[in-house]
Swiss-Prot record:
It is linked to Defects in Cys1 are a cause of polycystic kidney disease. GO terms for biological process: inner ear development; kidney development; positive regulation of transcription by RNA polymerase II. A lipid is attached at residue 2 (N-myristoyl glycine). Residues 1-129 are annotated as: Disordered. It is a lipid-anchor. Keywords: Cell membrane, Cell projection, Cilium, Cytoplasm, Cytoskeleton, Lipoprotein, Membrane, Myristate, Phosphoprotein. It is found in: Cell projection, Cilium membrane; Cytoplasm, Cytoskeleton, Cilium axoneme. The modification Phosphoserine is found at residue 116. This is Cystin-1. Interacts (when myristoylated) with UNC119 and UNC119B; interaction is required for localization to cilium. It comes from Mus musculus.
Amino acid sequence: MGSGSSRSGRIPRRRRSPDRRQTGPGETASEGGTADQAPTAAGQEESGRDPRPATPSGGREETLRLLDQLLAESEAWGPQELTPRGPARLAPAVSPEKKVKGNPEDSCASEAPGNSPKRPEGQSAISYDYSEEELMASIEREYCR
């Protein structure tokens, strides 16, 4: 399976502007362009916008500088300023099936070693959504038949 991303790591090609075309040996780049370039320039002036992305000279260096600055600032933020991505989940409700100790369906489900009601200090409780708990119980019932 793929990662789910529709974008690949390819960089889109940029078209060269007519005035930045490479010159051959013995040629010199003309400042005014050629006659076949004139209608294109006139069409751009009439439409009022340039279809090419406006990239100032040294734009790559400026972008890299800004990214470095942002990275340095984000490292200074630290974890105390991070915002949670979603609401905290409540502890799961215990289903009636799990309350019964002598349930034969639970016999095939292995318990994780070291599970105890007491947690060492510094560890946070992992909470699960009730629907996830029910799904796991139904999967256990299905495969323990």
